[in-house]
């Protein structure tokens, strides 16, 4: 989230966020609700929304409108944090561009570095385990564009219902998918 806020000239860093959201460094989890709360209370000049059930086309529409998108995805650590650690964790990645010719997104990744090229297929695989959740941070003057792009997903309850239907269909077609 620090990278996202810095995109809009915020002058803090990840440690500023951690003071409020992760006071215990060993805690590997910060959820989207906590991130949205931080934006609303510490970067109030920006709007923030998060939704579930995103897809590749939606990401591209938002990026084409000049709105970076942060997604939550699966991440695997190389070294365990504790005995029997499965090395799996959540990770946020800020998408800033895409290339249809190469079927990739450009991601700003706090772990792997800037301008990472992420194939659409890999992004879908890693994003799926978090219900394709996405976070949007944007200035107020972009709200009309965000509403138009999200369409019926702008309404939070409608977004949840539509996503529930989508995942119920997926469970019927692939009951082996743990996510």
PLM features: residue spans?
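Cysteine-nucleophile protease catalytic domains, especially the papain-like/related folds used
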Residues: 1-57, 65, 131-159
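Phenylalanine-focused residue identity feature
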Residues: 7-10, 15, 75-77, 92, ...
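Short, Lys/Arg-enriched charge-dense amphipathic segments
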Residues: 34-45, 71-80, 95-99, 157-164
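Active-site-adjacent substructure of cysteine-protease-like catalytic cores
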Residues: 54-110, 116-117
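Noncatalytic regulatory segments and standalone regulatory/sensor domains
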Residues: 82, 87, 98-179
């Amino acid at each position: 989230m620090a990278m996202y806020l810095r995109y809009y000239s915020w002058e803090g860093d990840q440690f500023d966020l951690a003071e409020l959201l992760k006071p215990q460094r060993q805690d590997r989890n910060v959820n989207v609700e906590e991130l949205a709360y931080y934006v609303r209370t510490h970067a109030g000049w920006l709007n923030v929304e998060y939704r579930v059930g995103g897809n590749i086309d939606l990401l591209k529409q938002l990026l084409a409108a000049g709105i970076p998108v942060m997604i939550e995805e699966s991440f695997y650590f190389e070294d365990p944090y504790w005995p029997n650690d499965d090395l799996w964790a959540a990770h946020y990645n800020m998408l800033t561009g895409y290339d249809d010719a190469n079927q990739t997104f450009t991601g700003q990744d706090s772990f792997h570095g800037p301008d990472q090229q992420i194939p659409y297929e890999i992004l879908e695989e890693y994003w799926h385990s978090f219900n394709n959740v996405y976070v949007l941070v944007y200035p107020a003057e972009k709200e009309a564009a965000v509403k138009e792009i999200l369409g019926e997903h702008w309404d939070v309850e409608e977004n949840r219902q539509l996503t529930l239907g989508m995942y119920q269909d997926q469970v019927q077609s692939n009951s082996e998918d743990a996510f």
